[in-house]
Design a protein with these regions (language model features):
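Bacterial N-terminal signal peptides
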Residues: 5-14
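Beta-propeller-forming repeat regions
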Residues: 15-364
Length: 364
C-alpha cells in the first residue's frame, strides 16, 4: 500500500478551473437524516429529492424547484433506505445493527391519482438488517430488479458480526426474494451498481464483484481486500467508481465507518490501493462526478463525526496527486450524498443529508 499526501493548498494545478458551488439549505428539521434519493416523483421533468431520516416516522420528499415538502409515507419506524423503480418506491425499515433486533421490513410504496398525497405501502419481505437498496438490470435484459444488501447475517453480533451476509433481489410485480449470494461475511455496508450491470460490495472482507452469468447464476470475484487491519477493522465500507480520462478507478471509505478515503487503480490486472486521506471521522458516503468538465472525475466524501464536513478531491494531473478542498466545512455531517443536475443547467450538482439537514450544493 502506498500513501499519498493530502495537499490543502489552493489553487489546483489542473488545466480547467475548479468547480464552484453555491450552498442551499432545503431542510433543517429532519431527525437522523440518512439517505437522499433523486427522482422525478410528480413527472414534471424536474428531479425531486426524497429525504429519508431514520429518526422520523414520515418519509418525505421535496418538490423541485421550490422544494415544497410532501409526505410519501407516514407511520414508519427506523427507516434505512429506499429506491425508486418505475412508478414505485421500495422502502427498507424496522432496522437495527443487531440482527436479533432487526425486523428488516421491506415495503413497496405506490402512488394514488395524486402523487403529492401519501402513497400506499404494501409489505413484500422481512429480511433482518435490510440496509442498502439499489436498482440494477442484473441480467441485461432491460428488466431492472431491486437489489437488497443486508448489513449483517442473521446470527451476527457485535463487535465482530461474524456470519454469512445475504445479498438478494426482487423482480417488480412478483416481489419474491431471490438469493444472489451469501458468500460475503461480516458487515456489508456499501454497494454500487456498475455500468456492466454487476454489483460491487464493500464489506469486512474487502471489495467484491457479483455478475450474473448467461445461465442466471452469480459469479463472485474478489477485487481487493480493503484496509489490511485485523477484523473487524478490516475491509471497506462504501464504494463508487470514477474515471480519470478513460482510466477507471474505485474510490472507497475504509474501514467500516472509517477514517480513510482510498483510491484503487488497475495495473497489470491488479488493483493498487492508495490512501489519499486518513482524517475522516465516521466516514459514510462517497461519490464521483466530473464537476468542472475537464474529463476527470472528482471525489465527494462525507463523514458524520466532527467537524461534520464534506470534502471534494480533485486529481492534479501535473503533480499526479489528489488535492482536497471543502464542499462544506462544518455544516454537514453527511450520512449520504447524491449527484444529479438539479437545476437543468447541464452541470452535476450535489445533494447531501445528515442529522437534521438536507442541502443542495449548486454547481456554478
Amino acid at each position: 500500500m502506498r500513501r499519498l499526501p493530502i495537499f490543502l493548498a489552493f489553487p489546483l494545478l489542473a488545466a480547467a478551473p475548479p468547480a464552484a458551488f453555491v450552498e442551499h439549505t432545503i431542510a433543517t428539521d429532519l431527525r437522523g437524516g440518512y439517505q437522499v434519493v433523486v427522482a422525478d416523483l410528480n413527472h414534471d421533468g424536474k428531479p425531486d429529492l426524497i429525504a429519508l431520516a431514520s429518526g422520523m416516522s414520515e418519509l418525505v420528499w421535496y418538490e423541485n424547484p421550490g422544494w415544497q415538502r410532501h409526505v410519501l409515507a407516514a407511520g414508519q419506524s427506523h427507516m434505512i433506505n429506499c429506491v425508486v423503480i418505475g412508478n414505485e418506491i421500495v422502502l427498507a425499515s424496522e432496522f437495527s445493527n443487531e440482527a436479533k433486533n432487526s425486523i428488516g421490513l421491506v415495503s413497496v410504496l405506490r402512488p394514488g391519482p395524486d402523487p403529492l398525497q401519501p402513497w400506499t405501502a404494501t409489505e413484500i419481505d422481512r429480511l433482518p438488517t435490510s440496509h442498502r437498496l439499489r436498482v440494477a438490470d442484473l441480467f441485461g435484459d432491460g428488466h431492472p430488479v431491486v437489489v437488497n444488501a443486508a448489513l449483517t447475517g442473521p446470527s451476527a453480533t457485535a463487535p465482530d458480526y461474524r456470519d454469512q451476509t445475504p445479498l438478494v433481489y426482487y423482480r417488480p410485480g412478483e416481489w419474491k426474494r431471490r438469493v444472489i449470494s451469501t458468500e460475503n461475511s461480516g458487515v456489508v455496508h456499501g454497494i454500487f451498481i456498475t455500468d456492466s450491470n454487476c454489483i460491487l460490495t464493500a464489506s469486512f472482507t474487502g471489495i467484491h464483484r457479483f455478475c450474473a452469468s448467461k445461465a442466471g447464476a452469480f459469479e463472485r470475484t474478489e477485487i481487493a481486500k480493503g484496509d489490511p487491519a485485523p477484523w473487524p477493522k478490516s475491509g471497506s465500507s462504501d464504494i463508487t467508481v470514477g474515471h480519470l480520462g478513460k482510466t477507471r478507478f474505485l474510490a472507497t471509505i475504509e474501514p467500516w465507518h472509517g477514517n480513510q478515503v482510498a483510491v484503487y487503480t488497475e495495473k497489470n490486472s491488479k488493483w493498487e490501493r492508495e490512501v489519499i486521506d486518513d482524517s475522516l471521522l465516521d466516514g459514510h458516503t462517497i461519490q464521483t462526478a466530473d464537476f468542472n468538465r475537464d474529463g476527470n472525475d472528482e471525489i465527494v466524501a462525507g463523514f458524520r463525526g466532527q467537524p461534520h464536513s464534506v470534502y471534494l478531491y480533485s486529481f492534479d494531473s501535473a503533480a499526479k496527486r489528489w488535492v482536497r478542498s471543502d464542499l462544506d466545512n462544518g455544516g454537514m455531517g453527511a450520512a449520504a450524498c447524491a449527484i444529479a443536475d438539479l437545476n437543468g443547467d447541464g452541470r452535476p450538482d450535489v445533494a447531501c443529508i445528515g442529522a437534521n439537514r438536507l442541502k443542495w450544493y449548486e454547481n456554478r
